[in-house]
Design a protein with these regions (language model features):
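A conserved regulatory-domain signal marking ACT and ACT-like small-molecule sensing domains
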Residues: 1-97
Length: 97
């Protein structure tokens, strides 16, 4: 199921305490709701991939520019056409009851 009402923001970030707080705080300060968050370390653990599910909004472009300026954010990708069912079935994949 492809969903165009939401965007998937994919981030490559440095992995250390406080990174997620800095990133989510940027959204909070702009009263922008995160619909979903998934984060996992990759490689040797020095970096992580974060996936943020957000509604299509006119302020998103400005937030992306601000994310790119954060020291701990190494890469930002914005995906409009993605399979939304990934987030719907994540609880089954992770075996969350």
């Amino acid at each position: 199921m492809i969903n165009t009402d939401f965007y998937l923001v994919e981030l490559l970030v440095r992995n250390h305490p406080g990174v997620m707080s800095h990133i989510t705080g940027l959204f909070t300060r702009r009263a922008f709701n995160l619909e979903g968050i998934f984060c996992t370390q990759i490689g040797d653990g020095s970096t992580s991939k974060m996936f943020l599910l957000v509604k299509n909004d006119f302020t998103l472009e400005q937030i992306i520019k601000q994310l790119e300026k954060l020291y701990d954010v190494l890469q930002v990708s914005l995906h409009q056409d993605y399979d939304y069912s990934i987030f719907q079935n994540l609880d089954k994949v992770l075996k969350i009851k």
